[in-house]
Regions:
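Sec-dependent N-terminal signal peptides of Gram-positive bacterial secreted proteins and lipoproteins
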Residues: 4-27
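PPIase-associated folding chaperone regions across multiple families
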Residues: 18, 26-29, 34-35, 131-183, ...
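N-terminal targeting/tethering segments
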Residues: 25-137
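Solvent-exposed, polar/charged alpha-helical surfaces in well-ordered, non-transmembrane soluble domains
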Residues: 42, 46-49, 81, 85, ...
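Solvent-exposed coil/turn segments that connect beta secondary-structure elements
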Residues: 44, 49, 180-187, 211, ...
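Sec/Tat-exported extracytoplasmic proteins
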Residues: 55, 87-101, 120, 127, ...
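Surface-exposed patches in mature extracellular/periplasmic domains of secreted proteins
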Residues: 103-108, 202-206, 241-244
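Peptidyl-prolyl cis-trans isomerase
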Residues: 191-229, 257, 261-263
Length: 331
């Protein structure tokens, strides 16, 4: 199995986990509170700078003047808190790697170590003087974080090793149709009969009789519309449906594309990602509830994101993917 084939898979899954794991405040959960070695400030700042600069590239530096959804927390504090949670997840995955992966010591081979060193050197050589001042990291710090990140990636693929990644066309099919929507069944039946006439123009009938301003629809297998109108998936290109009743409305469809290949492939990847994300979130939630890692180092309260234009680096993951994104396999 290829490790980390989806180049942003780990980042995506960790964001999902950070977003969906419930707070344990006020809830008694049997667990083992792990006393582990926390990341140093310099090690953490590698990830802080990455996310800070990605936000500023997308939203501009004024983003830090805003507040989060509750209207009270500065967005700056909110993002720093999420980086902390993110790294707590990475540390939890590393704990799993060291305690649960059989022969884990053989995973990080001399070849892997050599590649990670290349990644670390390329990253630190890419940093500007401003980046170095803000992050204040050494080559050893970077090497440590890339090694931890590698192990976290490995655990994700290990957890998903038995997942079936094959999604059939029938599960992900996307079609396109034109529609006519009417409230009167008899009139709808008459329109359907008229559409059978040679040369009948569906667009003309839609303009004349449809009560909906929407004529063209995209219907994805598994979405709300596919549940309402499963008959639409039985149509061939150019074929008309019978009159379909739903919620006191009467629908006539004409299939314009019985298999939208591009959208179907996109849908397939979306479903695959959702299945893998759900499977890993379940795996992680069970393990993390029994092995709670919470960073307590006070430096997290001191980190600032605003007023640091000197740092621009955003290539931590890009460099990792350059070396490992398509190549590694589970041992």
């Amino acid at each position: 199995m290829e490790l980390f084939k989806n180049k942003k898979l780990l980042l995506f899954i960790l964001i999902v986990i950070v977003g969906v794991l419930p707070s344990c405040s006020g809830i008694k959960i049997p667990n083992v509170n792990r006393n582990i070695e926390e990341y140093t400030k310099s090690e953490s700042m590698i990830f802080v700078s990455q996310l800070k600069n990605e936000y500023e590239e997308t939203f501009g530096s004024d983003i830090w003047k805003l507040t989060s959804g509750d209207g009270k927390t500065k967005y700056e504090s909110y993002v720093v808190s999420n980086v902390k949670k993110y790294l707590e997840v990475v540390k939890t995955l590393n704990l799993y790697f060291s305690t649960e992966i059989e022969n884990s010591s053989k995973v990080i081979t001399s070849s892997v170590n050599s590649q990670i060193m290349k990644v670390a050197r390329e990253y630190i050589d890419s940093l500007s003087d401003g980046d170095k001042k803000y992050i204040n990291c050494t080559l050893e710090d970077v090497l440590k974080m890339y090694t931890e990140y590698y192990k976290a990636c490995y655990v994700i693929e290990y957890a998903l090793r038995n997942e079936d990644n094959e999604i059939s066309v029938s599960e992900s099919k996307v079609i396109r149709v034109d529609q006519i929507v009417m409230s009167d069944k008899e009139k709808a039946t008459k329109v359907r009969e008229d559409l059978n006439q040679r040369g009948a123009n569906f667009a003309y009938f839609a303009r004349q009789y449809s009560e909906s301003d929407v004529v063209s629809l995209k219907i994805e297998r598994g979405d709300e519309l596919s549940g309402m109108f499963p008959e639409a998936f039985l149509l061939d290109n150019g074929e008309l449906s019978d009159v379909i009743e739903f919620n006191n409305k009467y629908y006539i469809f004409r299939c314009t594309d019985a298999y939208d290949q591009y959208e179907t492939e996109r849908r397939k990847e979306y479903i695959k990602k959702a299945i893998r994300s759900k499977a890993f979130t379940d795996f992680y939630s069970e393990y993390a509830s029994q092995n709670v890692i919470v960073f307590k180092n006070p430096y997290w309260q001191e980190i600032t994101l605003s007023n640091h234009p000197e740092t621009k680096t955003t290539n931590f993951f890009e460099i990792f993917n350059k070396y490992f994104g398509e190549e590694l396999k589970l041992q």
